[in-house]
Amino acid sequence: MGKCLLLPLLLVVLSSLLGFPQALECFQCQRVSASGVCESGKSFCQTQGSQQCFLRKVYEGDTVSYGHQGCSSLCVPMKFFRPNVTVDFRCCHDSPFCNKF
């Protein structure tokens, strides 16, 4: 049984050493409430290719209003500012479910 587990583990280690991207599980939700509860479209996604997990939070003043989580190919961390509204967009690829609200 130990030999059966050794081959998949060896393949994972070799692929990470050679730079092949590993699929990453991310939280996915179309609308996360200010308290962190998914209100619409709760599921998980798995990154493919150069995708990363993302988390977008929308603030009104200094208070979180709502958010959005998922997988994205276009993932550039940034902040947008408008009068009384801030949108914070963050990306991660360091660990599974790194886009927790």
UniProtKB/Swiss-Prot annotation:
It comes from the Eukaryota. Residues 24-101 form the UPAR/Ly6 domain. It is found in: Secreted. Pfam families: UPAR_LY6 (PF00021). Its main location: secreted. This is Protein PIP-1. InterPro entries: LY6_UPA_recep-like. Residues 1-23 form the signal peptide. It comes from Sus scrofa (Pig). GO terms for cellular component: extracellular region. Disulfide bonds join C26-C53, C29-C38, C45-C71, C75-C91, C92-C98. Glycans are attached at N84. The lineage of its organism: Eukaryota, Metazoa, Chordata, Craniata, Vertebrata.
